[in-house]
């Protein structure tokens, strides 16, 4: 059982980013509960790249915390490629500050949240959102973090 991490640092300032071992642990803690083998690219970017991707793929002209790009293998081809996560450093840092959350916990939450999207979970419909948020809470707790939605409900 393994998750292979391809880490890409595409931001100007890499000081204070989660380390490869941290990212690997968060991916393992999320994905290995669903499948035995996977390959995931985590690309940490600045606001300009996040904004461009968010506009291109979601029609939103602003940077966002995490974008998930699931890999869809051609029919009949089985590959362990799960997909790509693109995480915007500045947005994650700003949200952690605004939400009074430890930065490490918010980084972990973005990896968990994005990984669940790669696994096919979504939060468009209320019932899907409840299921996904509960999975996030459970996984974050297993990883040693507080409920990521606690501050959102106050």
From Swiss-Prot:
Q: Where in the cell is it found?
A: Cytoplasm
User: Where does it primarily localize?
Assistant: cytoplasm
Q: What is the lineage of its organism?
A: Bacteria, Pseudomonadati, Pseudomonadota, Gammaproteobacteria, Aeromonadales
Q: What is this protein called?
A: Endoribonuclease YbeY
Q: What does the record list as coiled-coil region(s)?
A: none
- Function, in words: Single strand-specific metallo-endoribonuclease involved in late-stage 70S ribosome quality control and in maturation of the 3' terminus of the 16S rRNA.
An MF annotation (GO) of this entry = RNA endonuclease activity
Which UniProt keywords are present, listed alphabetically? Cytoplasm, Endonuclease, Hydrolase, Metal-binding, Nuclease, Ribosome biogenesis, rRNA processing, Zinc
């Amino acid at each position: 059982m393994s998750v292979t991490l391809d880490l890409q640092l595409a931001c100007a300032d890499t000081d204070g980013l989660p380390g490869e071992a941290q990212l690997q642990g968060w991916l393992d803690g999320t994905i290995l509960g669903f499948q035995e083998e996977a390959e995931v690219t985590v690309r940490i970017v600045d606001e300009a790249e996040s904004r461009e991707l968010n506009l291109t793929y979601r029609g939103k002209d602003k940077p966002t915390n995490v974008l998930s790009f699931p890999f869809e293998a051609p029919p009949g081809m089985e590959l362990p490629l799960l997909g790509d996560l693109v995480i915007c450093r500045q947005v994650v840092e700003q949200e952690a500050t605004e939400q009074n959350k430890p930065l490490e916990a918010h980084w972990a939450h973005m990896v968990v949240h994005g990984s669940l999207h790669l696994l096919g979970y979504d939060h468009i419909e209320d019932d899907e959102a409840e299921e996904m948020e509960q999975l996030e809470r459970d996984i974050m707790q297993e990883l040693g973090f507080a409920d990521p939605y606690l501050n959102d409900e106050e």
